[in-house]
Amino acid sequence: MNKTPSKKSNKSNNSSRKSSKSKSPINKEQQSSTKQKATFELSTLRINSIENTPSPIEHICCLPSLSILALCRSDSSIEIWTTNTWIQVIKFPGLKSLQTRRVFLYHKKNVPDSAPLINKIRLFTCGINGYLVEWSLLSNLPKFSYKNPGGCIWDMQFKDKICLIASNDGTPRAVKVKKSSNPYLIKQFAKSDSRILSVCWENSTIKTKTRLFYTGHSNGTICKWNFETGQTLLTLSNPSADNDILIWTMCSINSKYLLCGDSTGKLLVYDINFGVLVKEFKEHTADILSIVSNGNPNEPSAYFTGIDSLICNVKLNTKNNEWILTSSFRGQSHDINSLSLLNENYLLSGGITTDICINHLYNGNMYQKYEKKINTNVKRHISPFEHKQNYYLSDFIDSSKKNILILHKKHDYCDLWILNINSNTSTYLAKIYKNKKNDSNILSANISRDGKLIMLSYDDITSLFSYDYDKNEIKKIKEFKHQSNYIFFSSDSSKAYLLSQKTSKVYIIDINALKVLKEISLNKDKDIILTCDFNYESNAIAYSTLSKQVYYIDTVKEEINSVPHPDCFISKIKFNTKNNTLILIDEYNLIYIVDIPTMKFTQWTTDRIEKTDFPINYVKWYNKIYGITIISKDVFLLYTDYNYIKVDLTKQLPKESLIEKNKMDKYVKSDWEKIIKEFHQKIFDEEYKGKEYSKIRNDMFSSTSNKKVPDISLDNDNFKIVSKFNSIMLMDMINENTMLVVENDWNKIVKTFPGGVIKPNYGH
């Protein structure tokens, strides 16, 4: 995977981080014993039969001023990412009925730079159900909404606090969004005979009181409007005689040019002042779905793509006022639904392949010409999988210690599986549904250590279920009127701990009495919880927030203490009960270890005050830590979506990490050209419809036997980066010598992607 530059880590402001530069000594006896210590292995169980397919990206919206972006997916979920370190800071499941098409981040004005991020932004979406929604970042639920009387909203575009919406009934509408109330209609324009599929404000380089905007229609026409008077200033008919041409996307440049992408794969460039088509590009074989401008009035250019995933770059030659094609590149294999320009160096794309693709630009072009290599583009893919854990394990549920339960949280239900560790086979048991009448998707879930209790949270409810393994029977016991972002059970399953960022409280539930025993208030300022962990021995909770704070909750004493931490996001937290410490991973993958009794950094941490104290290639490593697996008091594994790293606190850190690449066996090795060729054969076959697609998916995931893999070797190479698995969803110890790895096979996922060319008819 190719890499893009990342910002340097912020230095900690904490005084405890400012200790001596000298490394903690390791005595000769310890060194000798370390060298003599034989390599030992962990028996590895590898689960690959549990399907976890991410949803396609519908739209991406960047906010460069705050180094964040928002994206929405086809399953209605919404995510916010940092764009300098690529941490998924917010993800909430959305509502089933709010199938989103567009997302927008609004940067509030007159907010101090020192204010928390949550106070600086507002998040809006629109979709085919006809609602414009502002979301509460704390509750993960709609905060305010506007119901469009014209039905489906195909597109929206903001200018200050005014939102233009593309209505299904052909009527352009303008909605005002206020700070603490529902959006409301301020203007309604003349209705047309065709649906409006795209809207666009005029991008003017001259300040004027007159605001202009454009609408693209389902019959191929384009209209220019005066916002103040409501008059139609210009109507352009599509040059083709085909009335079924759809104008999916538009982009205004310098008050003079309007770029339009249509369903035939053409990019139309109009001189909008005279209503003249000045250029036509036919680089695509299917619909153009997204156009984005570089925003430079002196050297205008634009990027466009769509169902045919080729990304093209066109520029205006200012000497002769002619638009020319300068570069093109295919960075993703399937449909691209959205482009967004991060800055002059990076172009983002997202679509059917579910990941965020970062394309490196060279002077605005998609590739750089070298002396020996031409058409070379540096790109990087950001994994689509949620950073929050979605797989939960029970202890052994039988005296023979052969079987454990696995709870898999999906979008609107949970799957329960059983794993036999002797045969390494996983068997599907049951589905756990929330209240089907409720429109919300599942926010969090967990299973008790004994496997007899399951909880899941949605909307403002957390439901408790019992599970009888002998009868394979699930019963709902009670609904608690509390929203839970994280759920934990005590080791004896007598209590449940619900952590809610909406109310900023921890609710302790007595399982036998089915009532709330305690409510522990968190910090006064409500905040987004980035990551959280639970100590099964002390019932303590540790969590980090979006405002870059870390807290430790003693649920017995009902005390909350601040944990020492660097001045940056803490993306992962883990209790190490073997030595009573807390492991913190920051957004740059640097490691901090806190001694819990003293609430101070350990000597191992205070001796490493700079990024230069860590291996060079580890510091430059861009995969983010998804989880931490404790092996012993001094050894733990860090795992990402692609690989894992062994950390041994008793050994010196190498100057450079060894990298062990995957020795691909027959199962893992993939002929990507064959996969893509088969895919394109399917999508051009008119008989390849939903029924066939379902059959292929079922064939893919029907097998319950899991792949065999060599045991994980814990040798003397500290900080070794190992690539042995496919996408890692979970790594956890199920006994002293056995490691469980839940992974996704990306090849299976690719084969189940829907065909790009068989785009569903609009309106469906």
Which stretches of residues belong to each language-model region?
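WD40/WD-repeat beta-propeller blade N-cap
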Residues: 50-57, 93-101, 107, 146-153, ...
